[in-house]
Amino acid sequence: NFIFASISTLAREDVLSQFARDHFDYIIVDEVHRAGAESYKKVLDYFNSKFTLGMTATPERTDGQDIYRLFDYNIAYNIRLQAAMEAKLLCQFHYYGISDLTIDGLSVDDSSDTRFLTSIARSRHIKEAIDTYSMHEKRKRGLIFCRTVDEAKELSERLNTLGLRTLAVTGEDSEAVREDAIQRLQSDRRPDMLEYLVSVDIFNEGIDIPNLNQIIMARPTQSAIIFVQQLGRGLRKAKGKPFVTVIDFVGNYD
């Protein structure tokens, strides 16, 4: 007997109180790098299972929380990105760092105003880079990560006017809208199929699109965790996908 639940649901008092503390023999926690959050602590502190397994691709946190301590520093298995790629568990990636664009004498970077980040000039700059480095993909399927929701929406509109098929998907959208957007990206047959989903961070984790073949970073991040999460969206192996193309417009490679 198995129960699948989100932490947000399980942490609710009316749900958690339905279970005895020793109700579960095994507890498996996905995305356990979030376990420093109060909702995770509440659930993990409540249950007294015989065995608890935490899984994450990014165990390190930037807020000082020690996830390893929650498991008494017992590591069942550990494999890093490079080792996973060498073992052919993940697909290879081709990485292209694109130099900053200068608009009206100003260099577009992470501190730039949204009007520059979503300008026609920068949108064309992004489109030209996509055209240049997409020569190997017969059918483009990509995620574009932006800094803000407004930027994601405006950039999507700009890229659509330049001939790409994109859709901005944000936390404001329902689960049904997000699922439909993913299906449109995956499909080869739908007349409304998409080439790119543009978002801020809702696709950093928790999605599975094996045939994704492009990751486009139009946002900066000082977090190695977020960088690896976003890169990891494209590293699932799939038939006919020898590698994923990563195009970085904001110098994350520094």
Predicted regions and their residues:
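Post-DEXD/H (motif II) to motif III coupling segment of the RecA-like Helicase ATP-binding lobe
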Residues: 26, 33-95
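Conserved RecA-like ASCE P-loop NTPase motor core of nucleic-acid helicases/translocases
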Residues: 140-148, 169
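SF2 helicase motor core recognition
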Residues: 12-14, 88, 197-212, 232-236
